[in-house]
Amino acid sequence: KLKFEDTKTIVRIDNLQADNLIMFLKEELKEGGCAAVLLNTVRQVQETAHLLRQCFPDEQILELHSRYIYPDRKEREDELIRRMGKKSTAKERNGFILVASQAAEQSLDFDADILITELCPADFLLQRMGREHRHKEHDSMRPSNLSKPRCMILRDGEEVYSKGSKAVYAEYLLMRTQAVLPRQICIPDDIPTIVQKVYAEEDFFFQNISGYGQAKKRYEMEQGKKRGRAEGFLLQKPKTDDYEEESSLDLFLQEATKVNDKVAEASVRDGGSSLELLVLQSRSGKISFL
């Protein structure tokens, strides 16, 4: 029979000034352990990794984001799993620091002893917290000062979130997330409650936040634009009178002839445009694919 483990994790949440990041990591990792620094933009990842390399051995810093070509990214992901994955040893984890973007928060199974992160919408933030104290196999390896999970929210002076964060995530959702975050979270018990509070339509608890009304209007306008772009390419509902004569495929093909595929993709895709690049390299005077 399969065994179900009702595991609950209490995560304490604190703030950390960005200027104190290096000092904080030195203090927290002085007895060993590993840390994950998860940031909202690639630029922030690059700048932070560069800064940390000036104070920590290069082999202790792993930079990971979406701008690496596939072979390099795969190599870094493998290194992350070796150093912080389920089979990682205390020696492999000792002093290791991951500096990563959203590329690391979803599909990679790693376990950090402490998490430092920029603020992001509640569902993403909770997903990041799920990469902390993830494997019970590592509990006996954790230094005493890192024996209990902590999530440090990076702040830049009085600002709770950076301009880059507001460019990636709606400021409206960041405001609501910041307002509902408690000082500690029980995972998974508190997940539904926190997410529902952030995405609920009710505004009563948020109206006194400076700039909240304008942020909400911008969010609603953007959501309206996205719905409008998508609705223009919805398939028509089948007509009752013709339903027996025309299959769903017939109706799909009829609708498809009205829409240019590239125009449709550009209109409904939720995100910026992207280009697919083929990377070449020079070997012995010859050009070949990487």
Where are the language model's segments positioned?
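Ser/Thr-glycine-rich phosphate-binding loops at phosphate-binding pockets of nucleotides
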Residues: 1, 41, 99-103, 117
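Interdomain hinge/linker at the junction between the two RecA-like core domains of SF2 helicases
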Residues: 1-24, 28
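Short amphipathic alpha-helical segments, especially helix-boundary/capping motifs
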Residues: 2-3, 22, 54-56, 102-106
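Short, Asp-centered acidic motifs that coordinate Mg2+ and/or phosphate
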Residues: 11, 96-97, 114
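A short linear-motif detector with a strong N-terminal bias
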Residues: 14-17, 93-96, 126, 130
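C-terminal helicase lobe and adjacent C-terminal extensions/tails of nucleic-acid helicase motors
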Residues: 23-38, 43, 47-83, 87-88, ...
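Conserved two-lobed SF2 helicase motor
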Residues: 90-105
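Flexible glycine/serine/alanine-rich "lid" or loop that lines and gates the nucleotide-sugar donor pocket
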Residues: 109
